[in-house]
Amino acid sequence: MVIAQFKQGVVMLDRASVVDEQFLKRVLQGDFPQLRSSMSPDTAELDKKTAIEFFDSQIKSRLLDIIARQLKEKGLSFYTIGSSGHEGNAVLGQVFRASDMAFLHYRSGAFFLQRAKQLPGIDGVKDILLSLVAAASDPISGGRHKVFGSVPLNIPPQTSTIASHLPKALGAALSITRARELGLPSKLTPDSVILCSFGDASTNHATSQATLNACSWITQQNYPLPIVFICEDNGIGISVPTPSSWIKSSVSSRPGIHYIECDGLNIADVFAKAQEADYLARVKKQPVFLHMRCVRLLGHAGSDIESQYNTQEEIEQREANDPLLHTAGILYREGWMSLQAMVELYQDNRALIEAKALEAIREPRMSSAEEIMASIVPRIDKKQKYSLPDDNRRAQVFAGAYNQLALKRNLCQQINFALTDLMMQYPNMLIFGEDVGKKGGVYRVTADLQARFGQRRVFDTLLDETTIIGTAIGLAHNGFIPVPEIQFLAYLHNAEDQLRGEASTLSFFSSGQYQNPMVLRIASLAYQKGFGGHFHNDNSIAVLRDLPGVIVACPSNGPDAAKMLRTCMRLAYEEGRVVVFLEPIALYMTKDLYSPGDNGWLFEYPSPDEMISQGEVGVYGEGDTVILTYANGYYLSRQAEKVLREAHNISVKIIDLRWLSPLPKDAILKEIAKAKRILIVDEGRQSGSISEGLMTLLMEEASPRLKIKRITGKDCFIPLGTAWQYLLPSQESIIDAVIALQSDKREKESGRLVVS
């Protein structure tokens, strides 16, 4: 047999071999396990043809698991977490439409194969094999990761972080109704259902609990949510058992969520219960928790040795309940297939998969950094252009505030104006978060927006950042451009995986085919007077600095904020980008620059067509001493510049970075070309701050004759009251640092002065 080529010199992991051989042996003997549930094909209205199709998908999934381990032993495959024991989910791949977006668990092989049969031209077996061997021709990830995903099948790829996909599934469900209410074109049909599968152990994760809680919270407001949560309960999380009644007792009484239990070993029971779930979600638009009890075969993954935590008897007990044997028993008792026919189907599928595996291992893998990194940024699809709002529309929407547009305004007001203009321009833009509605946000940045655009486009969420960002991802899957708000920078850490693990990786793991554009607004940074402490004055953005493909913008003044926000929306809408927009809290209401009453930090609101391009820096002044800074640092540097010029006769050029990730390297190097001295003013902490990236850039790319110094925040949390001033850069410390740079005293390191 062809498989011998893989087996040569390889010892198959014992349990995979046992399960494989036992299936054939028991089928030939007609030795089938007793069903755990009473649902019959007749009662479930499951016909012969469909049942055999399910069996075929189950067999294919099982054999793919086995061959994945054989290939792994030869170094030809790289992933062995399989679907063995979960093959009952093949039924779900048929009951639900291929147009229903599915966020899948990593044990969804049979589901994927069965759904692939719904669309001509999709070879599910080949696609899975290409993914297993990390082939560059893998149609979903291009060999970047083993995922279940397909654009034609409406299956976005998911990460391996358990439960992390539940919040976006909820957001996608929300998007279906929201698109219909707003009369917007939708990628998903109005009667679509969102599917989200996961394991019993995942249900315990905080992210799952947050999503189920949010789901109940939304349904309590009688809002439609067509979603089916599919918990594939195999009774164990790697090595930790799940109490048999735990899932049911913890979920069945949740308000607003229908609980349906089914026997995942009985395809008739899954078929009947899945159709019930489909009706509740599709027709009644109500969320369902479908609890599918199954077993786990072959351990957690190929490297998992079950005997370390399970007895031989426990392992054999699970193997005796092989779902393939259960399905074979149903087919035999119904007279739909003979014993020999089932064996032949199994062996024919083995030959098919072996042949396709031989083809797959010959496929080239990615061979360069450029090729691998190509999908960090989504593919740019041609999008409908949205026109800027005309004067009549603006006058109508702004109403009483329209005449204020010509007045000089602060940062907070200019962001509000910009959001208003953008909401008029982009009908698929949604603003949401904690207190953004009637209250208008903690700092009134979103004041009056709900009155201007209604509760369907500007809405409050429950107080859970995981749900906020996850909802944004899900909405983006269906064509919306979400603009979620995180109330304070410190709160981002409650949900950073939704940004780091989910939103930022979708394009990468889908070869740029899927995108979840958004502009995530965060009230950020320190220097607030009379309010806060650390949790309202967090000055660390380290968590945002190393996210491939994510753009981080941070304005220092009103006009820049408006122009940059417009660019961020364009990047999200036209290029599918994920953008984080950091708004310096301390500058929201700032009016004066040099002295009380000078109104030096109030500016006219820029025309709606004015934008600042990504990577374009702000420049103020001239001189061979250059300050590189952003946000509050730019404001303080402007104050320091006046003193330096008037009291010390020192001319300073100040560069407002504006774009913190990726750093605007070309613009920086251009502006410092004639510089002799560089001062970096970074309000972030000394460790992990933007200053580190700037220092590296200057060391590697700038003139070795430059004198360089940085002043940063201390490696400390921000305290309550006024004590923060001892930790952060100030006007005085900037002045002192610039004066020190003028000295001829040099600490030399390769000819370069470095003072930190």
Model-found features: residue ranges?
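Conserved acidic/glycine
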Residues: V2-N89, V95-F96, L298-F453, L463, ...
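Thiamine diphosphate
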Residues: E87-A90, N154-M366, G437-N516, I522, ...
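Glycine/charged-rich beta-loop-alpha catalytic/anionic-binding loops adjacent to active sites
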Residues: Q70-G75, R144-T159, P190-S197, P255-Y259, ...
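Phosphate/diphosphate-binding glycine-rich loops and adjacent basic-rich segments that engage nucleotide
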Residues: K529-T625
